[in-house]
Amino acid sequence: MNVQLNSLSDTRKSLVVSLEASEVDAAHQEVVAEFARQARIPGFRPGKAPAAIIAKRFAKDITDEFKQRVVTKAYRDGLEKQKLDVLTVVNVEPGEVAQGKPASVTITVDVRPDFKLPDYVGLPTSVAPSEATEDEVDRVIEGMRAERAEFKVAERPAAKGDYVKLAYEGKIDGKPIAEIAPDKQIYSKVPQTWEEVEGANEGVIPGLGKQLAGLKVGDKKDVEIDFPADFAAVPELAGKKAVYAAEVLEVRERVLPPLDEAFFKAQHVGNLETLKVSVRSEIKRRKEAQNRAEQRRQVTDALTAKVDFPIPESLIESETQTVLRSFIEENMRRGVPQEQFEKDKKELFEGARQAATKRVKSRLVLAKIAEAEKVEVNEQDIDAFIYREAMRTGQKPDKLVKMLTTDREQLRAVQQSIIFDKAIDFLVSKATVTTVQPKG
């Protein structure tokens, strides 16, 4: 066997593995012998049928397995001889593989880039104070009251925070929106719906709720709406000015429950002070989790910015597809139409490729740190992963255990993910921390 190594780039290599005819024939004889041991031929005891009969009866299966065996041998022995750290097999060209003839197999692979790790101990991070302020505690308690609010009919003009029942019909340049976007009735003509007056969150029609204050039952108003240029929910309306003829049918005001015994009981506390202690603790827990997540992002960004190296193209391509698929699925769940993706596919691809490149680079660096620090995956790590996934997906832990024990690829992916997480945790544990007061 002879192995010729060609460097196509810093991370892409081509192996031309040449096998002598004797090596090819040995592989063929090995395959025929295996078929002979397993074959059941009438008139012969198991494993005793002549090789010629076996070769004739199972000719196609033997040929397929023989060619695969030669390619596998070339790949395995070629990598062993060249000591390559292969990340991806890009292409395999087996050439002609036949008995009695030498064979040449060309294997194109992407290899792990060689680079020196930068200093990764003492990376700078900043966090916000984790203690809850009185204002934050009060806002949370007000939110609890809002969740239990009652909405009572108000015999007065609508004010901020009220809910207004109204009917409306929209037109653009005098043409009913029902004709422009016939499959989107909620944007055209609705006999009744509820809108919050000057609410924090936009309703279906952007800006409609901000123009209802001061209206009372029976009032009619032409409301002008400027749809954003990037209004993906209904592309036909993007960048257009619409006029909605609205009529107020009812006004209801939000009435918050008092901070009394019934309210405290519903929150599983005895009094206001106990409630504040509970809320303060939850706010602190949430802030600490946010700080931790932010530190993880900061150390990863800081680390990858300190080192530069060529990134295997196959990893970027694969991760780009993963990023794109995730983005499209998420936005389709939000109602973004397929046509919008087609329209923006160039920008989407470029953005996905940039994100993928950054993600792959950080993983390569983290993998090298994990190796340097001897980060390993233990049984407790796998158990913790199974518990988290069971909680996140609602699956039974037993099902996840079965999946990991039967799917080796999935198990390797989980182990790799855990190693990355533990490497980031290590970086955070060694980072410097500065507490910074939030702006505003």
Swiss-Prot record:
Major location category of this protein: cytoplasm
Native source species: Opitutus terrae (strain DSM 11246 / JCM 15787 / PB90-1)
Domain PPIase FKBP-type: 161-257
GO molecular function, one term: peptidyl-prolyl cis-trans isomerase activity
Role according to the record: Involved in protein export. Acts as a chaperone by maintaining the newly synthesized protein in an open conformation. Functions as a peptidyl-prolyl cis-trans isomerase.
Lineage top rank: taxon: Bacteria
GO cellular component: cytoplasm
KW S-adenosyl-L-methionine (keyword) present: no
Annotated family: Belongs to the FKBP-type PPIase family. Tig subfamily.
UniProt domain comment: Consists of 3 domains; the N-terminus binds the ribosome, the middle domain has PPIase activity, while the C-terminus has intrinsic chaperone activity on its own.
Subcellular localization(s) per the UniProt record: Cytoplasm
Reactions listed under catalytic activity: [protein]-peptidylproline (omega=180) = [protein]-peptidylproline (omega=0)
Xref: Pfam families: FKBP_C, Trigger_C, Trigger_N
One record GO biological process: cell division
Keywords assigned: Cell cycle, Cell division, Chaperone, Cytoplasm, Isomerase, Rotamase
Protein name: Trigger factor
Top EC group: isomerase
Record carries keyword Cell division: yes
EC annotation from Swiss-Prot or TrEMBL: 5.2.1.8
Gene this chain is encoded by: tig
